[in-house]
């Protein structure tokens, strides 16, 4: 849904006719219900939240997440978002990140740091940051997760969510690709449109009207 704009010149599936109801599939398997979101999608809590509401117990992140935002201090967004998404959705996270250094892309590098996080946000296993292939292994106790989801009263953010209070979800922000060629310049123009839209305060009535809400 969220290419790494402006540099990734791709459309979201729903820009080209995909049904939004099909964009966050969850596979029911013998080892649990598994969903997947890619790279930049993880910086948007709505993506993994939708996976959770679609039944995901394990969320897989496939990523080429680079420094200076990557898996090393002082920013370490990689760890920050992996742990946060696990805790706020009460689900396991299996996050695989590219570990590579490319001389043609200074100052960027892909620091690896693949990890497995439990449903309380605890890191169960993590690869040391750096280039090269590494294998990360940890137990994923789906039975414990299911029991915790049933038992928990406090901090059950999925059950406590007040969706009706967040009017921004009904108001378009970043404009769709449309029929124009997607390139970096076009993405930058759409970013400016999105910034203007994000500055507009949304009341419940305005948001409902923009989303095709009820008439009088």
Residue ranges and their predicted role:
Residues 88, 97-205, 209-216:
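C-terminal beta-strand edge segments of enzyme domains
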Residues 1-36, 87-130:
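Catalytic-core segment of enzymes that process non-peptidic bonds
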Residues 1-58, 62-80, 84:
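Active-site catalytic loop in hydrolytic enzyme cores
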């Amino acid at each position: 849904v969220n290419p790494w704009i402006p540099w990734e010149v791709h459309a979201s599936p729903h820009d080209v006719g995909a049904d939004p109801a099909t964009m966050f599939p969850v596979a029911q398997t013998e080892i649990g219900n598994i969903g997947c979101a890619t790279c930049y999608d993880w910086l948007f809590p709505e993506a993994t939240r939708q996976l959770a509401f679609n039944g995901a117990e394990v969320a897989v992140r496939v990523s080429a997440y680079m420094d200076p935002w990557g898996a090393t201090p002082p920013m370490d967004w990689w760890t920050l978002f992996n742990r946060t998404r696990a805790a706020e959705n009460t689900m396991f996270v299996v996050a695989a990140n590219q570990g590579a250094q490319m001389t043609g892309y200074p100052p960027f590098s892909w620091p690896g740091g693949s990890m497995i996080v439990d449903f309380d946000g605890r890191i169960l296993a993590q690869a040391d940051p750096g280039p090269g292939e590494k294998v990360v292994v940890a137990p994923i106790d789906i039975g414990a997760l299911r029991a915790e989801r049933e038992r928990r009263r406090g901090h059950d953010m999925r059950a406590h969510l007040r969706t009706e209070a967040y009017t921004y979800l009904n108001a378009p922000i970043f404009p769709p690709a449309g029929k124009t060629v997607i390139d970096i310049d076009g993405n930058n123009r759409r970013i400016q449109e999105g910034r203007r839209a994000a500055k507009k305060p949304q009341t419940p009535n305005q948001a409902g009207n923009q989303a095709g809400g009820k008439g009088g």
